[in-house]
């Protein structure tokens, strides 16, 4: 039974998701379809990359991941000047870590990979001859590509192997002497604030080094990493390393629509800065370490 995951920006209000699933079930006999999310902000390939990067490894190798975000290709007939060639986008298949990823090469692939190296990358160039597919690529072209993978059609029979791909802009944390400057990259359903600061960024400064996590809401700094949300009392602020080892700031039992998530209470939005300042031995904050 072939597992196929679906990530898109087409929402749940309309028939679009059902239409994609219906065609997949016709094209791939016995397919097991798993929704990751269809609530990606329209055309936001960076968010799609974050969501899929956070969970793809939970699926067995051989899983096919379809990414229906900003899918319409930008093809050569639209080019009026050679300088525009870097704008070209094609439906592509990425193989990475034993998984298959079908998406438009619109920045998703490079952002998903980060520092990772693809096993292979294939471009579906025949799309230039299939204008009837352009307006709903996830239902048409992407389903056909998934079917070819399942049926073990050789990639050389329907794609061209390439080694270049685009990357959307995503901020990386800035690591300086005694400080990490990061950003909010995602706010989840509970209003929890997820940053681009990883656990390994913390560990570069050594173990048991005092620190302060600061953000927009003054006087609400955090100076401890908890193991679980319930390590603090209900409605208290908490910092943890989440399932993906990213620094997360939350309100215990807080939720948007309830008591209020951390994003509301702290006035945090996507892109807002989050700073971690360390106080190593001998610093003004940590003079006791010299005694």
Placement of each model-derived feature along the sequence:
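Fold-independent oxyanion-binding glycine-rich loops
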Residues: 8-10, 36, 68-71, 96-97, ...
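N-terminal glycine-rich anion-binding loop in soluble enzyme alpha/beta folds
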Residues: 2-39
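Active-site histidine-anchored catalytic micro-motif
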Residues: 3, 27, 32-33, 45-47, ...
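Conserved glycine-rich phosphate/nucleotide-binding loop
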Residues: 259-291
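A conserved acidic, glycine/proline-rich C-terminal tail/linker
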Residues: 196-269
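N-terminal beta-loop-helix "entrance" segment that forms/cooperates
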Residues: 35-55
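Anionic-ligand-binding alpha/beta catalytic cores of soluble enzymes and soluble regulatory domains
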Residues: 128-207
């Amino acid at each position: 039974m072939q597992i196929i995951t679906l990530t898109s920006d087409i929402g749940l209000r309309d028939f679009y998701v059902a239409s994609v699933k219906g065609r997949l079930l016709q094209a791939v006999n016995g397919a097991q379809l798993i929704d990751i999310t269809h609530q990606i902000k329209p055309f936001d390939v960076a968010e799609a990359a974050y969501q899929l990067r956070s969970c793809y490894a939970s699926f067995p190798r051989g899983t096919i991941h379809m990414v229906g975000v900003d899918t319409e290709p930008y093809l050569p007939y639209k080019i009026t000047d050679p300088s525009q060639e870097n704008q070209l986008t094609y439906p592509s298949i990425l193989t990475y870590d034993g998984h298959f990823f079908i998406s438009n090469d619109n920045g998703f692939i490079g952002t998903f990979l980060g520092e990772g190296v693809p096993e292979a990358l294939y471009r579906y160039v025949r799309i230039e001859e299939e204008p009837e597919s352009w307006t709903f690529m996830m239902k048409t072209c992407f389903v056909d590509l998934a079917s070819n993978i399942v049926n073990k059609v050789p990639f050389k029979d329907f794609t061209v192997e390439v080694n270049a791909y685009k990357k959307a802009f995503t901020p990386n944390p800035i690591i300086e002497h005694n400080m990490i400057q990061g950003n909010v990259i995602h706010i989840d359903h509970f209003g929890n604030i997820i940053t681009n600061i990883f656990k390994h960024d913390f560990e570069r400064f050594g173990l048991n080094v005092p620190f302060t996590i600061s953000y927009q809401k003054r006087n609400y700094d955090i100076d401890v990493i908890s193991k679980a949300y319930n390590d603090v009392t209900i409605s208290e602020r908490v910092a943890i390393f989440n399932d993906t080892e990213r620094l997360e700031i939350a309100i215990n039992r807080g939720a948007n629509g309830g008591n209020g998530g951390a994003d509301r209470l702290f006035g945090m939005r996507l892109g807002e800065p989050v700073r971690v300042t360390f106080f190593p031995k001998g610093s003004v904050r940590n003079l006791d370490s010299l005694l």
